[in-house]
Regions:
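Glycine- and aromatic-enriched mobile tails/lids
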Residues: 1-4, 9-11, 20, 28, ...
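Glycine-/small-residue-rich beta->alpha transition segments that form the dinucleotide
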Residues: 194-196, 200-205, 379-380
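Conserved N-terminal glycine-rich FAD pyrophosphate-binding loop of Rossmann-like flavoproteins
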Residues: 44-77, 81, 239-243, 252-253
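Short beta-strand to alpha-helix junction loop
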Residues: 84-97, 131-149, 159, 211-219, ...
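Conserved redox-cofactor binding core of oxidoreductases
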Residues: 104-188, 193, 200, 244-248, ...
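N-terminal Rossmann-like FAD-binding beta1-loop-alpha1 element of flavoenzymes
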Residues: 13-40
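An anion/pyrophosphate-binding glycine-rich loop and adjacent beta-alpha core
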Residues: 224, 230-341, 345, 407-414
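Core beta-strand elements of the Rossmann-like FAD/NAD(P) dinucleotide-binding domain
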Residues: 8-11, 186-196, 369
Length: 572
């Protein structure tokens, strides 16, 4: 019945997502020298959408002879407060230089140079060495544009403006065998039937009042894997970038002013004109890690020392207008578009939801704990621990995307394409079509409620009372989702897609809240007002969350200190 009514595309490798991870996975698999079919599915348009393209700052890699893998590793673990998966973090660090070389020599990327022709590397917060490779302040555009060109030049199939609605099981419920896909333009379903599936949609904490990711991001991959039964890790760890632009009355508030500004010397001030980071981080000041700077800014705002629009000021003019205009042309232009003069004056900024450190639990081959399912990029957890260093994000995506492509290409040969469960498909379609044409609640007030509640209860600072209240709000909103009505046809129905987004954001929000309740300490991006100190004795461990019989279940496990212990580097 299903095959007669819904188109089925058969493929060897299904890649959900077309950012740094998805494109690198496709290229590595295509270049593996094996005759395999590859299908990329993306909500946006390949090369034009997603978070990787939005990367401004750069890409961390050990290239200078005076730098070392061990230094980058220590910086990454200190930044992550030592709950990183050390095996994954080490893979990131040793493979990042390989990927930079590959992107330049094989894929056509070109990064900024020093006068001697070597790759220029700039300073970023939380790092002991200047190791951030960049293309001006528009690094992501360079990387994604070149990767997309390479994908178009190979025998790789792709579907733009299509979204995965749910991962599909085989009839025995033992393997993931693809996904149910919705053609966003036509409003019609198809089935991507696959031997192996990679989830790398990009995270997207857009369930907060202020957020940095592109509007098409809604924690899709994380929610898909969670509902399929995959284990998740570190979901309490949500990064808030310190400098999201405040644009009064605009939905673009939250868009980033990149970390390189602070790395180069930009300073932060409260409304009283005080350079407040001198109080919170006397040594590092504005170059402290993102969690420290965001929390410091937030505390200034809460204490009544914020700007008229609820932020703080960033002052880049202290570096000299000519320096700012030369080194940060993208940021200068963006601010000019909104009537702000970044090179000559102070600009209002606020902490903004930016990145999930948590995600699907994977091994060093990007395999999840579900047969046939891989994850990479922001959808995968464990690499960054409690806080991601700026510059490690796009490195993570391209490094582990490549690893996933290699792994899938090696493992797909001889793997049987087993039938999918048609009953599951019918049930999913019934669920997601339910709001169409139904008289009911308006979706958008529910979304506004979620964003405000998460900002206040599951945000930069937390406590038990607020977390419980936030989780209660999430449960109430989940109940109301069954009462939402969506008007209009199926074709290009933005409200229907926003309903699907909201469904995923609610699942991700619940995982954040439940995991945050369990961690009764403060560590990295997770700050508890009722437990303000780090507690290595009891909480040097990871929390895992898994859906069992329709309900979330929490597990915990001590961190595997396989390469480095906190005391080895004086981290107490």
């Amino acid at each position: 019945m299903i095959k007669g009514s819904i188109p089925v595309i058969e493929t060897d490798l299904l890649i959900l997502g077309a950012g740094g991870a998805g494109l690198c996975a496709a290229l590595h698999a295509a270049d593996a020298g094996k005759k395999i079919k590859i299908l990329i599915v993306t909500k946006s348009i390949i090369g034009k959408g997603g978070c990787s393209r939005m990367v401004q700052g750069g890409y961390n890699a050990v290239l200078n002879p005076n730098d070392a893998f061990e230094k980058h590793f220590i910086d990454t673990l200190k930044g992550g407060q030592f709950i990183n998966n050390q095996a994954l973090a080490w893979e990131l660090i040793i493979r990042a230089p390989e990927r930079i070389k590959e992107m330049e020599t094989k894929y056509g990327c070109f990064f900024d140079r020093n006068p001697d022709g070597s790759i220029h590397q700039k300073p970023f917060a939380g790092q002991s060495f200047d190791r951030t490779v960049h293309k001006g302040d528009l690094t992501g555009i360079e990387i994604i544009s070149r990767l997309a060109e390479q994908v178009f030049s190979r025998n790789i199939d792709y579907l733009d403006e299509h979204r995965a609605v749910e991962l599909l099981w085989d009839k025995q419920g033992t393997k993931i065998v693809g996904a149910l896909i919705l053609d966003v333009d036509r409003g019609e379903f198809l089935i991507a039937h696959a031997r192996t599936t990679l989830v790398c949609t990009g995270g997207g904490p857009t369930m907060y009042k202020l957020f940095a990711p592109s509007l098409d991001k809604s924690a899709d991959g994380i929610a898909l894997c969670y509902r399929a039964g995959a284990g998740m890790v570190d979901m309490e760890m949500v990064q808030f970038h310190p400098t999201g632009l405040i644009v009064k009355g605009s939905n673009t508030s939250g868009t980033l002013l990149e970390e390189g500004l602070r790395g180069a010397g930009a300073q932060l001030f409260n409304a009283l004109g005080e350079r407040f980071m001198e109080r919170y981080a006397p040594d590092a000041k504005e170059r402290a890690t993102r969690d420290v700077v965001s929390r410091s800014s937030f505390l200034e705002i809460v204490a009544g020392r914020g700007t008229p629009n609820g932020g703080v000021f960033i002052d880049a003019s202290v570096m000299g207008p000519e320096f700012v205009e030369k080194n940060f042309p993208g940021m200068v232009e963006r601010c000019n578009d909104y009537g702000f003069d970044l090179a000559h004056g102070r600009v209002e900024v606020s902490p903004t939801a930016h990145f999930f450190m948590g995600g699907v639990r994977i091994d060093t081959h990007c395999l999840t704990d579900l047969d046939g399912l891989y994850a990479a990029g922001e959808d995968a957890g464990g690499v960054h621990g409690a806080n991601r260093l700026g510059g490690n994000g796009i490195a993570d995506s391209t490094v582990f995307g490549g690893i996933a492509g290699d792994s899938m290409a090696n493992n797909v040969i001889g793997r049987e394409l087993v039938p999918f469960d048609e009953t599951q498909v019918e049930e999913i379609i019934k669920q997601v079509e339910a709001p169409l044409g139904r008289e009911g609640l308006d979706l958008y007030p529910l979304r506004d409620t979620l964003r405000l509640s998460n900002w206040e209860k599951l945000g930069i600072t937390r406590d038990e009372k607020g977390l419980l209240e936030g989780l209660q709000t999430i449960q109430e909103l989940k109940g109301k989702m069954d009462q939402v009505g969506i008007a209009g046809s199926r074709v290009c129905n933005i409200s229907w897609n926003d309903w699907l987004n909201m469904r995923n954001l609610l699942d991700a929000s619940e995982m954040i809240g439940r995991s945050a309740l369990e961690r009764k300490e403060s560590r990295g991006a997770h700050y508890r007002n009722d437990f303000p100190e780090k507690n290595n004795k009891e909480y040097l461990k990871n929390f895992f969350i898994k859906r069992e019989k329709g309900e979330p279940k929490i597990y915990e496990r001590p961190v595997a200190l396989s390469r480095l212990r906190p005391e080895d580097v004086g981290f107490e």
